[in-house]
Structure formats: C-alpha cells, structure tokens
C-alpha cells in the first residue's frame, strides 16, 4: 500500500503504482488531484476500486491531538464507534508528531497515555476487535469485494 504526501495524487500516479505492484491506496475521503493541473477534488469510499484494480483505504478516525486538541481520545473513539455500528472497518490516522518528545516531553507523555487509553477502551468496548496493517485490511477487502459482504 502507499499514501501520497498530503493526499495529493492523480491518475498517472495510480497507474505507475499499479505497475510496481501497489494494490492499495491510503488516504482520506477527499483526494486532491495534481496541483500542476487545475486542482480538483475526488471523493472515495472504503473499498472503492479504481480503473487499475487498486482499492482505496480511507482513513476515517483521527488521533491527532498535537495538531488539534479536538482530534484526541473522545473524537477518535466516537468516530470508531460510528464505523463499527455501520459494520465498516476503522482506520485510525495518527502521526509520529503525536508521540515524539524531542521538543515537548509533556506532549509525548500525554499523547502516549491517551493513545494507550484509546486502545484499551476499544478492546473493552469491542472485545472481538481485530487490529491489522493496511495491507492486511486491503487483502480482506479485495477478497470480499465480489461477495455479498461489501466494505
């Protein structure tokens, strides 16, 4: 799988990625196409397949308390609950910025504590939850794509 920087890519990138064996494209619900051409937006849903046969894996839960305090524990658990109530997989987006302490040790410690609390809350609320990598989720989606179960 791959994710384009800042969620900016176009069809040419998808074609090249497919040629080198990339099956899954990670991103948000909204994709910005190349700024070299007039910027335009495309919208994707979890498990959508493109013309190259690749699947989109859309990030739908966010743990980004360093960037925006409202994107911490409560919001992430709420978004995850919404996904699970709809029988959809949850992909949690987070970045190392939330967990490094070089500049702000308190930030690292607080966010590591909150992320651990989030994982514990998920397991407590959903004891049969499965954690997997993006590639593993992509494999599940691609296997289920042509069955009655749609992601």
List each model region and its residues.
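Active-site-adjacent pocket scaffolds in enzyme catalytic domains
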Residues: 1-86, 91
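C-terminal domain-boundary segment and adjacent tail
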Residues: 19-40, 91-151
């Amino acid at each position: 799988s791959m994710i384009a920087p800042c969620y900016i890519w176009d069809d040419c990138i998808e074609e090249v990625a497919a040629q080198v064996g990339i099956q899954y494209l990670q991103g948000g619900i909204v994709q910005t196409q190349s700024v070299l051409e007039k910027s335009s937006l495309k919208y994707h849903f979890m498990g959508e397949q493109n013309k190259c046969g690749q699947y989109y894996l859309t990030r739908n839960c966010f743990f980004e308390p360093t960037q925006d305090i409202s994107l911490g524990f409560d919001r992430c658990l709420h978004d995850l609950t919404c996904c699970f109530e709809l029988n959809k997989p949850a992909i949690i987006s987070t970045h190392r910025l939330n967990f490094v302490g070089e500049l702000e040790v308190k930030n690292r410690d607080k966010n590591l504590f909150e992320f651990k609390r989030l994982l514990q809350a998920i397991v407590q609320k959903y004891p049969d939850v499965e954690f997997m990598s993006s590639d593993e989720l992509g494999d599940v989606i691609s296997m289920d794509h042509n069955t009655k179960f749609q992601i």
